[in-house]
Amino acid sequence: MNSSYHPPDMSQRMPGPGYSSSVPPPIHAYQQQQQHQHPPPSLLPPPPTQHHHSSHAPPPPPPPSSSSHSLSSHQHHAPPPPHHHSQLPPYPPTQYQQPHPNQYPRPHPLPPSRNDEPPPPSSEPSPSDQHEKPKYEPPSVSKIEEGTGLKYSLDVQQQPIRARMCGFGDKDRRPITPPPCVRLVIINSETGKEVDYNTLDHAMFVLSVDLWDKDGIKEVNLVRSSTGPGSGASSNNYSYSTLEPSTPSYQQQALPPSRESGYPQGQGLGYAQEYPPSVQQGYGQAPSYQSSSSYGPPQQYFPRHSGYNTDPPASSANPLFRNGYGQDQNALTRMAVVGTQPQGMFTRNLIGSLAASAFRLNDTDKKAGIWFVLQDLSVRTEGTFRLRFSFVNVGGAGGGLPIHVNQGRAPILASCYSQDFSVYSAKKFPGVCESTPLSKTFALQGIKIPIRKDTNIKGEGDEEMMYDQN
């Protein structure tokens, strides 16, 4: 036993090279050897590598190894070792599970690369390009006149930009600014050159204007206006082609309002609560408005008067007579039209001078040409629109000296569309456009174009500017 305790001397020998800074007591060093020998597999992973190397230095001496072997064998025979063995298995799996999480982050950088691979955002600009495609310019028409061989075409030199809606009244007129100016181009089909406009007779040249939607697909010349008290005007635009003559759209304007349409229902005076049967009026008599102040179901009257014929007689009040037995089909259709559609009349959305005569004018470069100036055009409702210009020669083909007006049909020799312009409400209107040099040039030649005077002094110029904006 004494020999077993002498190893501390050996430990004092060995720590010399291993522990240069501090020499622990021999008992403490021996305990470190026992701790290192009892759980070598379990304590290897938790402690740092430096402690493993420091504890690994003392084991070389043989006496501690024999004692450690005896101790380890003694621990295997003792009951505590099974408890140590139960603690040993959980540690190794933790050592193997730790590297796996380090391997899992590796696939994480792969998904970002996959996210970078699909380029749906790059495909998103393509729809925007498709939205830009509808902004095509509607096609223009250019034809050659029979008999003369002249080819006519239209060129909108001054495009409309904006306007303020004028509403459904006739007093407040807000012209489109700047006024559209269209130049008529005439080319000789034989020579391919423009004709001399100074020698051309333009007295029978006429340009008509229509209002179209912003894409130039359909016309929107009509708009329904509501005339009822306290009701605003509708901004639904319509075209002439959608309103067929066979439909009762125009006939309904002559029909009475909703009050009178409900009033004929009392022609039979089915108000038994107010009037006795002896006082009831006949079918042909028109009751006063006082008797029709309260509306009730007309069927209440007929069962109580067996003396009257249930079939309505042929009278002027027949079409408007309403009962549960004999009803006029035409009257029903008219009543259905009045009931389903709101009150109001169709009116033109584009108002003003919708046809213009030609003028021989000089442009800003003092070059003569045939021009159409449309300075009196207004739009009732707000929105984005286009103008379609159609040129017609109402004179005889050939343009002889004895000018005569064509009494039949005149073909459209040229047509074109303007760029889209915006019509604003009174609150959103940014103001009229500045007068252009072309407008000023035409105004000096006698064309009635509203020109805003350029002056910095308070006076007529400022008053005119305020008048245009208000």
From Swiss-Prot:
One of its GO terms (cellular component) is nucleus. Pfam families: Velvet (PF11754). Residues 147-452 form the Velvet domain. Residues 1-148, 223-321 are annotated as: Disordered. InterPro entries: Velvet, Velvet_dom, Velvet_dom_sf. Keywords: Cytoplasm, Nucleus, Sporulation, Transcription, Transcription regulation. Disruption phenotype: Exhibits reduced pink pigment formation, but increased yellow pigment production. Down-regulates the six genes involved in biosynthesis of the pink pigment aurofusarin. Also down-regulates the genes involved in the mycotoxin deoxynivalenol biosynthesis. Suppresses of aerial hyphae formation, reduces hyphal hydrophobicity and highly increases conidiation. Impaired virulence on flowering wheat head. Residues 74-86 have a biased composition (Basic residues). Residues 15-37, 232-241, 280-301 have a biased composition (Low complexity). Residues 242-255, 307-318 have a biased composition (Polar residues). It is found in: Nucleus; Cytoplasm. Residues 38-49, 102-124 have a biased composition (Pro residues). One of its GO terms (biological process) is sporulation resulting in formation of a cellular spore. Belongs to the velvet family. VelB subfamily. Component of the heterotrimeric velvet complex composed of laeA, veA and velB; VeA acting as a bridging protein between laeA and velB. Forms a heterodimeric complex with vosA; the formation of the velB-vosA complex is light-dependent. PANTHER family: SPORE DEVELOPMENT REGULATOR VOSA, VELVET COMPLEX SUBUNIT B. Component of the velvet transcription factor complex that controls sexual/asexual developmental ratio in response to light, promoting sexual development in the darkness while stimulating asexual sporulation under illumination. The velvet complex acts as a global regulator for secondary metabolite gene expression. Component of the velB-VosA heterodimeric complex that plays a dual role in activating genes associated with spore maturation and repressing certain development-associated genes. This is Velvet complex subunit B.
